């Protein structure tokens, strides 16, 4: 019997000198190969392109194909490879990998550990974070503060979700199946010597009593009090659409204002608002409340749907590749989701 391979020695535990600033040095993203259009959904459930677009603004989303080897961890790994390339780094340069996901393929190990193996990050620590759609923003705040405190110098934050694995693609499940898509996005966060770079204000919130508005039951005890157990719903996202919409509309704008106030800036100081892509009406409502021009609120929900924890980093990567964000700008990231959770991160890039 062969002895197990001895892994490379990890980076020595230490408390390094705290940096003056923190910066995002690279981004990457990955979509599955197969788009899932409204026209396709019309063939498998009672719905229409017009009905979907009017209510969500979504024309298409992407769905993994396991036969192609696509999964949460493979999308996450590819997004991270692209982020490392953009930052001019190798995987062995990483100190830590944080993967925000609510669709791990296994209970153990963490998706982050499989991502570390796939990319060759032999010296990095790794763990998962589950805050649903808020996950990447929570991870970004966590990475920033770990670096700011001097514990680490270079962290990868990945948001990856494949909600297609939790969907019921029949008329019974159309309330959620029309909304969600699969994707992954990643950002490299590093220490720097510029004190002007990093988070100006951040927040992370939870209303645990709202858990029953978005949940995935696995057995009888997982259903909220007063809701009859239905085994056909096991493993499928259950969402109270009206309650979630009301929560999002009320919370979204308040969260943005709270973050602006904490940083001592106004909406006109923002160069870009990068929001979780949940619903076109919610996005436009927030933009109008703060008087932002269309070019300062990025939108891709029409092309990719609601990609949950991948939503914000996917937007960030598309903006970077299009040259629409640059060092020195103020960019706010905002997200909300199951839990109920919501959070923000206002950066001086």
Model-based region annotation:
Residues 2-68, 171-246, 250, 254:
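Condensing-enzyme catalytic core mediating Claisen C-C bond formation in acyl metabolism
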Residues 4, 9-10, 73-80, 84, ...:
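Claisen-condensing/thiolase-fold acyl-transfer catalytic domains that form or cleave C-C bonds
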Residues 24-26, 52, 83, 94-97, ...:
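Buried hydrophobic positions in well-ordered alpha/beta secondary-structure cores of metabolic enzymes
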Residues 25-28, 100, 130, 155-161, ...:
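Short beta-strand segments
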Residues 45-54, 106-120, 157-166, 221-229, ...:
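Acidic-glycine-rich active-site phosphate/pyrophosphate-binding loop
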Residues 86-122:
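Anion-binding (especially nucleotide phosphate/pyrophosphate-binding) glycine-rich loop
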Residues 92-100, 267-276:
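Short glycine-rich phosphate-binding loop at a beta-alpha junction
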Residues 148-183:
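Flexible, glycine-rich active-site loops centered on histidine and acidic residues
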């Amino acid at each position: 019997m062969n002895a197990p391979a001895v892994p490379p020695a990890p980076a020595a535990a230490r408390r390094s000198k705290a940096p003056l600033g923190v910066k995002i040095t690279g981004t990457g993203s990955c979509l599955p190969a197969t788009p899932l259009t409204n026209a396709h959904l019309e063939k498998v459930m009672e719905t229409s392109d017009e009905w979907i677009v009017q209510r969500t603004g979504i024309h298409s989303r992407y769905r993994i194909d396991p036969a192609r080897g696509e999964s949460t961890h493979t999308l996450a790994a590819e997004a991270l490879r692209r982020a490392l390339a953009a930052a001019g780094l190798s995987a062995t340069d990483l100190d830590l990998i944080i993967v925000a996901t609510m669709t791990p393929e296994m209970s153990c190990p963490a998706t982050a550990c499989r991502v570390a193996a796939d990319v060759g990050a032999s010296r990095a620590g790794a763990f998962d974070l589950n805050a649903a759609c808020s996950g990447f923003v929570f991870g970004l705040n966590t990475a920033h503060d770990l670096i700011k405190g001097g514990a680490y110098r270079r962290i990868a934050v990945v948001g990856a979700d494949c909600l297609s694995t939790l969907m019921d693609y029949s008329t019974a499940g159309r309330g959620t199946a029309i909304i969600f898509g699969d994707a992954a996005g990643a950002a490299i966060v590093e220490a720097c010597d510029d004190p002007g770079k990093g988070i100006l204000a951040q927040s992370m919130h939870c209303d645990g009593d709202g858990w029953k508005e978005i949940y995935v039951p696995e057995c009888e005890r997982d259903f909220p009090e007063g809701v009859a157990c239905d085994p056909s719903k096991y493993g499928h996202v259950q969402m109270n659409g009206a309650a979630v919409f009301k929560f999002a509309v009320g919370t979204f704008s308040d969260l943005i204002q709270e973050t602006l106030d904490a940083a001592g800036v106004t909406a006109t100081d923002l160069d870009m608002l990068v929001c979780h892509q949940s619903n076109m009406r919610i996005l436009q409502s927030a933009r109008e409340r703060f008087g932002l021009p269309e070019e300062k609120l990025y939108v891709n929900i029409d092309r990719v749907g609601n990609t949950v924890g991948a939503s914000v980093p996917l937007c960030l990567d598309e903006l970077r590749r299009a040259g629409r964000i640059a060092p020195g700008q103020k960019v706010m990231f905002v997200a909300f989701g199951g839990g109920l959770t919501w959070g923000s991160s206002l950066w001086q890039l």
